[in-house]
Each structure stands twice: as structure tokens, then as C-alpha cells.
């Protein structure tokens, strides 16, 4: 296993702290009925702890061909372990479950695509029980940011629309191989119920549009008549609006488009 070198191009930093691994798996709260999907298992440190807790099945999605033999050998004794040799974005999670089953999605996400992976989760709400991710602390702070703060961005609004977010803990660089140049964090994302957004892709584009030139007043992006219908001052900037404000404006715009 020591021969496996983390690949910079894949944004790999392997978690090596047993204590942190156990805390992450505690947060997953595994039962024997659970279907767990792990993104980027690497050499299997988190994978091993998950399997020790005996879920119904663990699918490990790994793009790096150099670790495939390591994972296959290490976990060959587990009948509930399935390795998917693929890019996460090419895997259809819906094919891994039966009707009404849900997935616990976990992983130490590659820093270079973590935000894209989290955004992708908003398009799979109906099959996710929750997500537990290790990500860059800077990204985690954006996920939980409030209006009128520097960390409040498109990502904050979009993800807070669809998920309740728990900041579990910070993880120093020394707990990884190689140590990243930044601090990491563990977050838990639980899908909200009864979300008033029917077209997630359109909503995503809408939020992204409003956050372009975030210091500009929103009346430069949305007709004042629409803003008045939504009960929003046209002189506000995107960074000053709450998640509820964005949802309300989008609802008015959607109705007008019909």
C-alpha cells in the first residue's frame, strides 16, 4: 500500500488519522440496512472503517486505476463491497438502488472537483438520505455562510436551498498524506423536505446569474415589477438576499415565464 502515491492531478490527499476516520463514520451512523456509496476511496482507510460497521452494501467509486488492485485485494473478504471503476460523474446512482431505497453518500472529496460534486447532489435529492463529505474548509465555510458576508456566494444559496448543513469538524493538514496546503472540514448535508423548486437546473442558472457582479443591485438583473411582486427591494444586492428571498424571486419569475 505504501507504493501508492497520491496523484496531484486527481486532487488526492489520503486521510491517515484513525481518530478522524472513526468520527466521520460515527456521523454516518451505519445500520445493516444501509446502502452506502463512497466517492474516491483511495487506498481504503475510510472504506475499511465503514465495512467494519457492516452496512448492507458499500459501493466504492474510484477513478484511479492504480488503486483498484489494492482495494480489490484488501476487501476481497467482504461480500458487501463493490468497487466501481469509474469517474463519479459517469455513475448513475439510480441504478444502484431499488424503488424507495436511499443512499448515504460519503467521501473524502478531491479538492479540485468538490464543489461540482456537491452541486451534483442537488439533482439527486430523491435518492439521498444524506451526504457526509470531507472538503476544503474554505468550501465548507461557503456552504454555511450567511448573507452580507464575504463567504456568501452562489454555492451558499444553491446548496442551502436544498440541504440542511451541519459543520461537523475541522481537520488539520497533518492528518493527510500528502498534507494539503489548506485545512479541511467534514460536513453533513441532509436533504430538506418539501422544497418549492421544480426545475433545479433552471434555479441553478438563475442563482448563478444573480451572483455575477455580486455588488450590482438586483434591479440590473431582474425587472423591478417582478421584484415588487416578490416583496424584494430592487436596490438590494445578491449578497444581501436570504435563501428564502432567492426562492421567492425565482417563483415569481417562473410563474411569469409560463
Swiss-Prot record:
Keyword set, alphabetical order: Cytoplasm, Methyltransferase, RNA-binding, rRNA processing, S-adenosyl-L-methionine, Transferase
EC number(s) recorded for this UniProt protein: 2.1.1.182
Compartments, as annotated in UniProt: Cytoplasm
Molecular function GO terms recorded: 16S rRNA (adenine(1518)-N(6)/adenine(1519)-N(6))-dimethyltransferase activity; RNA binding
Keyword set includes Transferase: yes
Alphabetical list of Pfam families matching this protein: RrnaAD
UniProt-listed Gene3D superfamilies: Ribosomal RNA adenine dimethylase-like, domain 2, Vaccinia Virus protein VP39
Predominant location category: cytoplasm
Enzyme class, broadest EC rank: transferase
Catalytically driven reaction(s): adenosine(1518)/adenosine(1519) in 16S rRNA + 4 S-adenosyl-L-methionine = N(6)-dimethyladenosine(1518)/N(6)-dimethyladenosine(1519) in 16S rRNA + 4 S-adenosyl-L-homocysteine + 4 H(+)
Positions bound to S-adenosyl-L-methionine: 13, 15, 40, 62, 87, 108
A single cellular component GO annotation: cytosol
Keyword match Methyltransferase: yes
PROSITE patterns xref list: RRNA_A_DIMETH, SAM_RNA_A_N6_MT
NCBIfam families: ksgA (TIGR00755)
Family: Belongs to the class I-like SAM-binding methyltransferase superfamily. rRNA adenine N(6)-methyltransferase family. RsmA subfamily.
HAMAP family reported in the protein's UniProt record: 16SrRNA_methyltr_A
Function description: Specifically dimethylates two adjacent adenosines (A1518 and A1519) in the loop of a conserved hairpin near the 3'-end of 16S rRNA in the 30S particle. May play a critical role in biogenesis of 30S subunits.
Descriptive protein name: Ribosomal RNA small subunit methyltransferase A
Source organism per UniProt: Sulfurihydrogenibium sp. (strain YO3AOP1)
Gene name of the encoded protein: rsmA
